[in-house]
Protein backbone atom coordinates (compact mmCIF):
# COMPACT_ATOMS: atom_id res chain seq x y z
CA UNK A 1 0.00 0.00 0.00
CA UNK A 2 2.86 2.39 0.73
CA UNK A 3 3.88 2.22 -2.96
CA UNK A 4 0.56 3.71 -4.10
CA UNK A 5 0.25 6.38 -1.41
CA UNK A 6 2.49 9.22 -2.50
CA UNK A 7 3.59 12.41 -0.81
CA UNK A 8 1.44 14.35 -3.24
CA UNK A 9 -1.63 12.39 -2.18
CA UNK A 10 -0.85 12.99 1.50
CA UNK A 11 -0.42 16.71 0.79
CA UNK A 12 -3.74 16.84 -1.06
CA UNK A 13 -5.54 15.04 1.79
CA UNK A 14 -3.97 17.40 4.32
CA UNK A 15 -4.82 20.61 2.45
CA UNK A 16 -8.22 19.35 1.31
CA UNK A 17 -9.14 18.32 4.84
CA UNK A 18 -7.90 21.64 6.21
CA UNK A 19 -10.00 23.61 3.74
CA UNK A 20 -13.04 21.41 4.38
CA UNK A 21 -12.91 21.79 8.15
CA UNK A 22 -12.20 25.51 7.88
CA UNK A 23 -15.37 25.86 5.78
CA UNK A 24 -17.30 23.81 8.36
CA UNK A 25 -15.97 26.14 11.07
CA UNK A 26 -17.08 29.21 9.09
CA UNK A 27 -20.52 27.71 8.54
CA UNK A 28 -20.99 26.91 12.22
CA UNK A 29 -19.78 30.39 13.19
CA UNK A 30 -22.27 31.97 10.78
CA UNK A 31 -25.09 29.77 12.10
CA UNK A 32 -24.25 30.70 15.70
CA UNK A 33 -24.21 34.41 14.87
CA UNK A 34 -27.60 34.11 13.16
CA UNK A 35 -29.33 32.20 15.97
CA UNK A 36 -27.77 34.00 18.94
CA UNK A 37 -30.31 36.88 18.99
CA UNK A 38 -33.15 34.34 19.16
CA UNK A 39 -31.60 32.55 22.15
CA UNK A 40 -30.71 35.44 24.43
CA UNK A 41 -33.10 37.36 26.64
CA UNK A 42 -30.85 40.38 27.01
CA UNK A 43 -33.82 42.72 26.55
CA UNK A 44 -35.28 41.47 29.85
CA UNK A 45 -32.17 42.33 31.87
CA UNK A 46 -33.03 44.71 34.70
CA UNK A 47 -31.01 46.45 37.41
CA UNK A 48 -32.13 43.73 39.84
CA UNK A 49 -30.71 41.06 37.52
CA UNK A 50 -27.37 42.90 37.36
CA UNK A 51 -27.29 43.27 41.16
CA UNK A 52 -28.18 39.58 41.51
CA UNK A 53 -25.25 38.64 39.28
CA UNK A 54 -23.00 40.76 41.50
CA UNK A 55 -24.28 38.86 44.56
CA UNK A 56 -23.63 35.60 42.68
CA UNK A 57 -20.07 36.63 41.84
CA UNK A 58 -19.18 38.28 45.17
CA UNK A 59 -20.21 35.17 47.12
CA UNK A 60 -18.52 32.78 44.66
CA UNK A 61 -21.68 30.74 44.16
CA UNK A 62 -20.11 29.19 41.07
CA UNK A 63 -17.44 27.71 43.34
CA UNK A 64 -20.01 25.09 44.40
CA UNK A 65 -22.92 25.40 41.94
CA UNK A 66 -23.05 25.24 38.18
CA UNK A 67 -25.01 27.70 36.09
CA UNK A 68 -26.00 26.56 32.60
CA UNK A 69 -23.39 23.82 32.84
CA UNK A 70 -20.50 26.11 33.86
CA UNK A 71 -18.97 25.98 37.31
CA UNK A 72 -18.45 23.40 40.01
CA UNK A 73 -20.50 20.24 40.43
CA UNK A 74 -20.38 20.12 44.23
CA UNK A 75 -23.91 21.53 44.59
CA UNK A 76 -26.97 21.53 42.29
CA UNK A 77 -27.24 23.21 38.90
CA UNK A 78 -29.07 26.53 39.32
CA UNK A 79 -29.78 27.46 35.70
CA UNK A 80 -33.28 25.99 35.95
CA UNK A 81 -33.93 26.29 39.69
CA UNK A 82 -36.60 28.96 39.05
CA UNK A 83 -38.67 26.45 37.07
CA UNK A 84 -37.91 23.50 39.38
CA UNK A 85 -39.07 25.42 42.46
CA UNK A 86 -42.45 26.47 41.16
CA UNK A 87 -41.90 29.56 39.07
CA UNK A 88 -43.21 33.05 39.66
CA UNK A 89 -45.51 32.42 42.64
CA UNK A 90 -43.28 30.31 44.86
CA UNK A 91 -39.66 30.90 43.90
CA UNK A 92 -38.86 34.05 45.88
CA UNK A 93 -40.41 32.78 49.13
CA UNK A 94 -38.59 29.48 48.63
CA UNK A 95 -35.24 31.19 48.07
CA UNK A 96 -35.69 33.45 51.11
CA UNK A 97 -36.53 30.46 53.32
CA UNK A 98 -33.70 28.37 51.89
CA UNK A 99 -31.07 31.06 52.41
CA UNK A 100 -32.24 31.70 56.00
CA UNK A 101 -32.19 27.98 56.85
CA UNK A 102 -28.54 27.47 55.89
CA UNK A 103 -26.58 25.54 56.98
CA UNK A 104 -29.10 22.73 57.38
CA UNK A 105 -26.78 20.63 59.51
CA UNK A 106 -27.93 17.32 58.06
CA UNK A 107 -25.31 14.72 58.99
CA UNK A 108 -23.39 13.24 56.08
CA UNK A 109 -24.58 15.88 53.61
CA UNK A 110 -22.81 18.76 51.97
CA UNK A 111 -23.46 22.03 53.77
CA UNK A 112 -24.16 25.39 52.19
CA UNK A 113 -22.74 28.19 54.34
CA UNK A 114 -24.82 31.02 55.76
CA UNK A 115 -23.99 34.09 53.70
CA UNK A 116 -26.11 36.50 55.80
CA UNK A 117 -27.56 38.14 52.71
CA UNK A 118 -30.03 40.99 53.06
CA UNK A 119 -33.62 40.64 51.86
CA UNK A 120 -32.75 42.86 48.89
CA UNK A 121 -29.76 40.70 47.96
CA UNK A 122 -31.88 37.54 48.04
CA UNK A 123 -34.53 39.25 45.90
CA UNK A 124 -31.84 40.32 43.43
CA UNK A 125 -30.41 36.79 43.37
CA UNK A 126 -33.91 35.48 42.68
CA UNK A 127 -34.27 37.89 39.75
CA UNK A 128 -30.89 36.79 38.39
CA UNK A 129 -31.79 33.10 38.62
CA UNK A 130 -35.20 33.81 37.07
CA UNK A 131 -33.49 35.63 34.19
CA UNK A 132 -30.99 32.81 33.60
CA UNK A 133 -33.79 30.25 33.53
CA UNK A 134 -35.32 32.04 30.53
CA UNK A 135 -32.19 31.82 28.36
CA UNK A 136 -32.71 29.41 25.46
CA UNK A 137 -29.80 27.04 26.00
CA UNK A 138 -30.95 24.54 23.40
CA UNK A 139 -31.73 22.13 26.27
CA UNK A 140 -28.29 22.37 27.85
CA UNK A 141 -27.34 21.18 30.39
CA UNK A 142 -29.29 17.95 29.99
CA UNK A 143 -29.76 17.51 33.77
CA UNK A 144 -33.23 18.93 34.52
CA UNK A 145 -33.26 17.85 38.18
CA UNK A 146 -30.34 20.05 39.25
Swiss-Prot record:
* Cell compartments where the protein resides: Cell membrane
Alphabetized, the UniProt keywords read:
Cell membrane, Electron transport, Heme, Iron, Membrane, Metal-binding, Respiratory chain, Signal-anchor, Transmembrane, Transmembrane helix, Transport
Expression triggers: By nitric oxide.
> Per its UniProt record, what InterPro entries does this chain match?
Cyt_c-like_dom (IPR009056), Cyt_c-like_dom_sf (IPR036909), Cytochrome_c550/c551-like (IPR051811)
GO cellular component assignments? plasma membrane
Q: Which cysteines are joined by disulfide bonds?
A: none
Q: How does it sit in the membrane?
A: Single-pass membrane protein
Transmembrane stretches, start-end: 13-29
Specify one Pfam family. Answer: Cytochrom_C
At which positions is heme c bound? 61, 64-65
A single MF term (Gene Ontology): metal ion binding
Q: Main role? A: Component of the anaerobic respiratory chain that transforms nitrate to dinitrogen (denitrification).
Q: How does it assemble?
A: Heterodimer of cytochromes b (large subunit) and c (small subunit).
Name of the protein in question:
Nitric oxide reductase subunit C
Q: Which species does the entry assign this protein to?
A: Stutzerimonas stutzeri (Pseudomonas stutzeri)
Taxonomy, top ranks, is: Bacteria, Pseudomonadati, Pseudomonadota, Gammaproteobacteria, Pseudomonadales
In the UniProt record, the gene name given for this protein reads norC
